[in-house]
From Swiss-Prot:
Renumbered zinc finger spans (C4-type): 56-71
Protein name: Recombination protein RecR
Species this protein is from: Streptomyces coelicolor (strain ATCC BAA-471 / A3(2) / M145)
Keywords, comma-separated and alphabetical: DNA damage, DNA recombination, DNA repair, Metal-binding, Zinc, Zinc-finger
Listed GO MF terms: DNA binding; zinc ion binding
GO BP field: double-strand break repair; recombinational repair
HAMAP family reported for this sequence: RecR
Annotated gene: recR
InterPro entries in the cross-refs: DNA_Rcmb_RecR, Rcmb_RecR, Rcmb_RecR_Znf, TOPRIM_dom, TOPRIM_RecR
Residue span, Toprim domain: 79-174
A Pfam short name: RecR_C
Highest taxon of the lineage: Bacteria
Thylakoid keyword on record: no
Length: 199
């Protein structure tokens, strides 16, 4: 344990996802040893991202304007929507350069253990996007873990009666893994081999 502000910094860094106590301590001491100008740049970047970045009004992806770049891109196919859990999944899929449709970010996955139900996700917004009938295919690209599968099944059962083609990314993604950690080739193959969900 350190005193005062040093321990406060370590504690705050430790609250970040994927940063354990040892990593938090290493980062804190890196910051302490950094030049003041570098620390100011980091602090400024943190403040700016909180002030300028929001979530796209259409799809829920990160954006600096009302709509994200993908929703504003007229070259994207608006008839195909890929449903993902988080904005980081959009980045992972975009790296493959395989998908030319639009996205819908749910903001998580159904997880009763964590107290996250369907009403906590952006499902109502998805249904509103599907209401005009212009979407012909919905690709469910939730994580291949228990929560992601539960979310995909829930959505498929809800949307299937609308007559849309509902597909799920193919295997190749490790069960229990997260999309953001998949390499481009694996994720690209999973996209190519997506399958129809029969519920």
């Amino acid at each position: 344990m350190y005193e005062g502000v040093v321990q406060d910094l370590i504690d705050e860094l430790g609250r970040l996802p994927g940063v354990g106590p040892k990593s938090a301590q290493r980062i804190a001491f890196h910051i302490l040893q950094a030049e003041p100008v570098d620390v100011r740049r980091l602090a400024q970047a943190l403040m700016e991202v909180k002030a300028k970045v929001r979530f796209c009004a259409t799809c829920g992806n990160v954006a600096q304007e009302e709509q994200c770049n993908i929703c504003r891109d007229t070259r994207r196919d608006p008839s195909v929507i890929c449903v993902v859990e988080e904005p980081k999944d959009v980045v992972a899929i975009e790296r493959t350069r395989e998908f030319r449709g639009r996205y819908h970010v749910l903001g998580g996955a159904i997880s009763p253990i964590d107290g996250v139900g369907p009403d906590d996700l952006r499902i109502r917004e998805l249904l509103a996007r599907l209401a005009d009938g212009s979407v012909t295919e919905l690709i469910l690209a939730t994580d291949p873990n228990l929560e992601g599968e539960a979310t995909a099944t829930y959505l498929a059962r809800m949307i299937k009666p609308m007559g849309l083609k509902v597909t799920r990314l193919a295997s190749g993604l490790p069960v229990g893994g997260d999309l953001e950690y998949a390499d481009e080739v694996t994720l690209g193959r999973a996209f190519e081999g997506r399958r129809l969900l029969d519920v």
